[in-house]
Amino acid sequence: MAASQGGGGNSGGGGCSGGGSGGGGGAAGGGGGGGGGGGGGAGAGGGGGCGGTVAVPIPVPTLFGQPFPNGPQWHPGSLQPQHTVRSLDRALEEAGNSGILSLSGRKLREFPGSGYDLTDTTQADLSRNRFTEIPSDVWLFAPLETLNLYHNCIKTIPEAIKNLQMLTYLNISRNLLSTLPKYLFDLPLKVLVVSNNKLVSIPEEIGKLKDLMELDVSCNEIQVLPQQMGKLHSLKELNIRRNNLHVLPDELGDLPLVKLDFSCNKVTEIPVCYRKLHHLQVIILDNNPLQVPPAQICLKGKVHIFKYLNIQACCRMDKKPDSLDLPSLNKRMPSQPLTDSMEDFYPNKNHGPDSGIGSDNGEKRLSTTEPSDDDTISLHSQVSESNREQTSRNDSHITGSKPDSQKDQEVYDFIDPNTEDVAVPEEGDTHIGSFVSFLKGKEKSSEKSQKNEEPPNEKKVDKEQLLPEEEDDDLKEVTDLRKIAAQLLKQEQKNRILNHSTSVMRNKLKQTVECEKSVPADEGNSPLSPLAWQPLENQKDQIVDQQWPESQPIIWQNEERRRSKQIRKEYFKYKSTRKNSSGNENEEQESDNAHMSAQSPVSSEEYDRSDGFSHGPFGLKPRSAFSRASRQEYGAADPGFTMRRKMEHLREEREQIRQLRNNLESRLKVILPDDIGAALMDGVVLCHLANHIRPRSVASIHVPSPAVPKLSMAKCRRNVENFLDACKKLGVSQERLCLPHHILEERGLVKVGVTVQALLELPTTKASQLSMA
């Protein structure tokens, strides 16, 4: 109405318009309207009617009937300055009626005092003001659920906030907070927004917020996130944008996050455990110096990032040598179909100290031969088996003990019975030396510079013997093996004491035999002569009982004692008939034979049958790695014999590896790292060596790039196979050619050195002729 009247005159219209706008302000505006009207009358001259009209205030439109949005869906950027058209009194009055207090954008420095009852307020919006502290009137709002203090000048949060025990939403962003008090986390908060402050850390007490669903600490100066954030089991959204974070805690991988924003930080690696974030829908990671995953993968999006993390997790798991996707003996596994995107960022195998690959564990306990490769193992074992069968058919005198000792013989599958006799240490010494070497290998497995080639047959034995132990933790395994080694040391000492007592008793036995030989013939024919041999038989019983080690099974001991007693009885019957006719030399020899027969596990019938050809000095008995005669004969051998042989073998391998390093560095003019096995595993250096010997012998070489610093296993295998093919074409003989897994698994550096040496020894004329062809 005032606006229409204002249009009546030129100058008077301006006055009426001023009065109309002033009238909207309430009582103060009325004065403005009067003044405006007077101005209009003076200016218009004939328009006094316009100046005298009183402007009627127009009520506020229904747009502000809901001055405060429901719930925690506020977005400070969308707030409009339309609240300025309302009076404080009306806002406070509506807050008393509706429980929603909205004082946003009024530039208030203090909370306006009023006579309104605001104790039932459930939502309070005090954003965009100039409060330097949270108004004390707010602590009286006991049922308060939502508090918005966005864009003020608040520096601290007082302890009185604990009175708001129903507060679930708190927005105190864009203030001057430097710390968050511990008592803040005693509230049942579901949404906490503290962005754009000066926070340098988050208290560990944040783990108390079990119901927290959204946390925004962006645009602060936080350097480390506490591990207690892993206890926020209800957290859906986490915003840590624009801070000084270098590392993301692994505990976040266990949260049900839907949105994660850690952009504009200094994070270099996404933890592998983040692959467990199955509910994650949005991940924002731009403006970070990420190295893992590489940049080109991060640009492809969330799906590729999680693929990379899954592959990385598979590669970091402990791998057994037989579970690798590598070609094995006489059987090449088909290559897995990989897409280009997967192949580009398939990580390299992690041959760490825990993976069981490429480390010299010293697990060479039971093998007595050291074949060169897997082909030699299978061939040698077949020949040994056929020889044993033929020997068992020809030499029937040893068949009686074969079933009882079959279990003991399984660990000596690689021993040829027709080979010449060599010094075989005692059983206790063999096991002790092997376990000591195994323990030393376990303790030094973390030093990758001592990686040496392990003969494949020893790995084959270890897979059968230690498969249950490899599944346990390394610390428990080493502890158990130390206990076993200690028990074997004690057993070995007992065996030596028994052997010493046996030798003493044997000397006494010989002295007794000599005394009996000096007895006259008529006294030997007297009926008392068997009684004279009775103490000797008792002594022999004691000797035989002492010679059996305590580690033998009870059934074996009883069987052998029964057989030895039967042999002794028949022997004394036989000797009593020939005692007068036999000479001193024969008697001494028979005494020794009786002593040896008491030790050999054969029956009496077999003893009679074999007496014709094995009665002599027992030199024609078949060789067996576990025969007691061999152990008794070589009982005095040096217990460190096996250890010395192993150390000599390791020294030879180190020398060959050093020669391999010298050959590569001198030819290629490069400096290889200390871990030469890892340097050669991708096949790049070896392919360059082949091209150095003859250009273009390897047509294509897969090399790492800055974006993908490690080649995939498929590309490594391709390089290695190309190198071996080039060696064949250049003329390297098959017996000097290594296998692919010697390079890929870092287990055959000696074989690789032989191949490289053979490649370097090729005559230049032959290589040139091949290139001409």
UniProtKB/Swiss-Prot annotation:
Function statement: May play a role in the organization of the cytoskeleton.
Entry-linked Pfam families: CH (PF00307), LRR_8 (PF13855)
SUPFAM superfamilies: Calponin-homology domain, CH-domain, L domain-like
Matching SMART domains: CH, LRR_BAC, LRR_TYP
Region described as Disordered: 1-46, 324-409, 438-478, 573-633
Keywords: Leucine-rich repeat, Repeat
Descriptive protein name: Leucine-rich repeat and calponin homology domain-containing protein 2
Gene name of this polypeptide: Lrch2
Ranges of the LRR repeats in the UniProt entry: 97-118, 120-141, 143-164, 166-187, 188-209, 211-232, 234-256, 257-277, 279-300
Top-level taxonomy: Eukaryota, Metazoa, Chordata, Craniata, Vertebrata
Listed Gene3D superfamilies: Calponin-like domain, Ribonuclease Inhibitor
Domain Calponin-homology (CH): 650-763
Biased composition annotated in UniProt, kind: Polar residues: 594-603
Biased composition (Basic and acidic residues): 386-396, 440-466
CDD domains linked to this entry: CH_LRCH2
Statement: the UniProt record of this protein carries the keyword Repeat: yes
InterPro entries given in the database record: CH_dom, CH_dom_sf, Leu-rich_rpt, Leu-rich_rpt_typical-subtyp, LRR_dom_sf, LRR_domain-containing
Listed PANTHER family: LEUCINE-RICH REPEAT AND CALPONIN HOMOLOGY DOMAIN-CONTAINING PROTEIN 2 ISOFORM X1, PTHR48051
